[in-house]
């Protein structure tokens, strides 16, 4: 794994919320077992992080420390970064009333890294983010 700086949109302040697939499966099982009156739930980990915090956790999962390069708005965020330029934070209190414990983002990222490392043939990069960065915004550190 090469050491690369991370090209951070807008100083990394946008908020993100994730949900591990194992928690989704557990929640579906809870719904089937409990048959709650409510049928609509916002699902997500109650842990809200900024892009910068998320990237730091991703790097930690692989035993690295990130170096950040801020990217200004002259570049469209989706050309070099996987998330759209908007944030959302869901109220997951109703989910939490049925399932109070979820996998931490840090642990989920660690598990996913191990899986991806063991299954490189399953990794498919849909967008050429690195190519865009190298051609249009790369800086020498």
Which residues does each PLM region occupy?
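Non-catalytic, hydrophobic alpha-helical segments
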Residues: 24, 28, 43, 54, ...
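Structured loop/turn residues at secondary-structure junctions
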Residues: 11-13, 46, 100
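Residues at helix-coil transition
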Residues: 1-2, 33, 63, 114-118
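Amphipathic terminal alpha-helices
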Residues: 105-141
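Short linear capping/connector segments at secondary-structure termini
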Residues: 9-14, 73-77
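Mid/C-terminal beta-alpha module of Rossmann-like enzyme folds, strongest
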Residues: 31-80, 140-141
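Conserved C-terminal active-site "lid" loop/helix of NAD(P)H-dependent oxidoreductases
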Residues: 21, 75-102, 107-111, 121, ...
């Amino acid at each position: 794994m090469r050491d690369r700086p991370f090209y951070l949109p807008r100083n990394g302040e946008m908020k993100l919320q994730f949900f591990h697939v194992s928690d989704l499966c557990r929640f579906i099982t809870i719904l089937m077992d409990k048959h709650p009156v409510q049928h609509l739930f916002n699902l997500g980990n109650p842990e809200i992080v900024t892009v910068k915090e998320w990237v730091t956790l991703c790097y930690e999962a692989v035993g690295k420390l990130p170096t950040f390069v801020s990217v200004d708005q002259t570049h469209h965020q989706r050309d070099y970064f996987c998330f759209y330029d908007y944030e959302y934070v869901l109220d997951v209190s109703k989910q939490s009333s049925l399932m109070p414990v979820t996998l931490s983002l840090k642990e989920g990222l660690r598990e996913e890294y191990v899986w991806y490392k063991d299954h490189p043939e399953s990794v498919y990069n849909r967008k050429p983010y690195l190519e865009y960065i190298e051609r249009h915004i790369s800086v020498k550190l």
